[in-house]
Amino acid sequence: MAAARKSKALVGVYPGTFDPITLGHLDIIRRATKIVDHLIVAVARNAGKGPLFATDERVEMVQNEMAVLIEQGSTNASTIEVLAFDNLLMHFCQSVDARIIIRGLRAVSDFEYEFQMAGMNARLEPRIETVFLMASERQQFISSRFVKEIGQLGGDVSSFVTAPVRERLEVKFARGDRSQA
């Protein structure tokens, strides 16, 4: 009987710039894979935000982190993929048959913005729901913007990102790519 009720896979999209991907993002990804059958980590090109890392670099960093999650057994390869997008989020969700948008919330200020976005998205495509996941206590204050600022000023970011991401930040800032932080 359960097999008869089984519909097509529930696809979720976790969008972001991931500039860079942080431990907070990874926490949301791990938890989101428990909610949906297939999670697409959607890396926004979003040149308007002036990213430190190019889109292909951000996609590569996220893919590398997903490989680690898979290796650790936190998820499996069939449940997650990483794609870049540069169009309206709702159009992207429609193109991948997603029915859920995953968003992480750290603070009340996040909620206000995300609440407005969820309302706009619901108007654009009422069949796609937005699901909010509260940041874990240890991750509540992590933001990519703060990580870049700390890294740019020579601070230790190892409590906020994985070692490979920290190394990429160090390389960027050693080359003088500081204008975007």
What kind of feature is each model-predicted range?
Residues 1-181:
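Nucleotidyltransferase catalytic core that binds NTPs
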